[in-house]
């Protein structure tokens, strides 16, 4: 009887620890047909926002990727390549944690800074202007060009309404009204 209970308990634990994986086929299909991969930067050192007095031109003054975040970004890039998904360009916020996420995920590409991706957390930047500029940038893309954009939680939320954890991604596409819609989430 004890052995049976132990096996049942072990089975329950195994079921609980099995990762749930959503069907990301719609997102992958959208990305392959020219969708935009919109990512929140990978895991960082503990904290919220950046330290007082941080500077964009000095990574040592910012909250940066942790070792786990660098590994997470590399694994995400490898997961995309394993699914035969490539991107032709990668753009990033000017924050080091976003640039480093992009470099770790896509080491073969040059990372271009796109100011519309810069954080507007805690009153920095201009939420409405940047979100509008990003929406226009995405809708102006050539439909067959696959692009990855690395940014911050507030930017993704403002553009799509999706609240992503660090390292999560959505695929977005222009809609028929001049806006942007989420085609799906990707488990990277």
For the regions a language model picked out, list residue spans one by one.
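Active-site-proximal alpha-helix that buttresses catalytic centers in soluble enzyme cores
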Residues: 24-113, 120-124, 162-188
């Amino acid at each position: 009887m004890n052995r049976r209970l132990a096996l049942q308990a072990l089975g329950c634990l195994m079921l609980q620890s099995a990762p749930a994986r959503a069907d990301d086929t719609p997102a992958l299909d959208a990305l392959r047909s020219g969708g935009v991969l919109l990512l929140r930067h990978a895991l960082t050192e503990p904290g919220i926002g950046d330290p007082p007095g941080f500077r964009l031109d000095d990574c040592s003054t910012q909250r940066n990727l942790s070792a786990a975040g660098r590994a997470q970004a590399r694994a995400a890039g490898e997961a995309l390549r394993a699914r035969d998904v490539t991107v032709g360009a990668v753009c990033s916020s000017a924050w080091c944690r976003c640039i480093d996420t992009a470099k770790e995920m896509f080491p073969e590409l040059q990372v271009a800074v796109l100011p519309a991706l810069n954080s507007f957390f805690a009153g920095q930047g201009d939420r409405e202007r940047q979100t509008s500029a990003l929406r226009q940038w995405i809708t102006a893309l050539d439909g067959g060009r696959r692009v990855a954009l690395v940014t911050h939680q507030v930017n993704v939320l403002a553009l799509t309404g999706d609240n992503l954890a660090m390292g999560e991604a959505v695929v977005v596409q222009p809609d028929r009204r001049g806006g942007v819609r989420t085609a799906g989430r990707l488990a990277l």
